[in-house]
Amino acid sequence: MYKSVLVPLDGSMFGEHALPSATSIARRAGARLTLAYVHEPAATFYGEGAVILSNDVDAHARLQKQAYLERVVLRFGDACPKQVSSLLLEGGVVEAICNQIAKDKTDLVVMTTHGRGPLGRFWLGSVADKLLRQLSIPLLLVHPGQTASDLKSDPVFKHILIPLDGSDLAERILTPATSLGQLMASQYTLLRVVKPAHPALPYTEGLSIAQMAGEILDRIEKLQSELRMEAHSYLTGLAEKLRASSLHVRTRIVFEEHAAAAILHEATSCGADLIAMETHGRGGLSRLFLGSVADKVLRGSMLPVLLQHPSE
């Protein structure tokens, strides 16, 4: 269960779109909610032709950020969680946030995929991406809208889609996903995307084209059946464990060459309002996130995505 939720803010309207989901989770879990804004002290340059930034200017910027945090807390009104605080952190953004997470024993970070930047800069390489690479706690990433967020809204995730690839690494998302879902009486769909079988061509001497085609189809059907049985056994075993905790779980097997496309299609088909997955599965920890299945899902869906980078 979540006990401490942190929301990094950057002073932009985009960054605030993480707040409704964060407060909804914090209220239901009785967790502490921390709003964090990082102040990066401006460097002072000396030398001919250099612009010298006075301490007064830096202090003024710090006060503006502190005032912003206070205004955000006031905007919650009656919807404000019982344990909410705001913190102005100092230093580099990623380092300051990571240090605060370690200090406060934060177990969930909620943030938008991007904040400031021209044309809504892609999240890869942003603070969210860098945090995901450094932290082993889950990050709930929310895509920002074009209008100001309603801080008094109460989003609920009623249906969580959990893609799994059969690896132990991928299964680690089950704990944070179900911890979140239990707060909201969610139902879950465990999805296994299986690549279609591509059997080797049969020995062709003496076979007609029709016989060869029939042989290939028979091999495909046999392999597909074996793959389906394996996936069914795997998902059924996981589902039974979750149902033992009184969770509402269904399973789904899809044959598709491209896993991300299948996940996005299934999210729409089953009416999911949250996708939860590990950043790495069978590819292992050395695999770059760029171009991975989780990366493509995050870019391709407007749904919130709960991601976790597995620790070794």
Predicted region positions:
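Gly/Ser-rich helix-loop-strand patches that form or flank binding pockets
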Residues: 1, 24-28, 98-150, 264-312
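Hydrophobic alpha-helical membrane-association signature
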Residues: 18, 65-68, 127, 173, ...
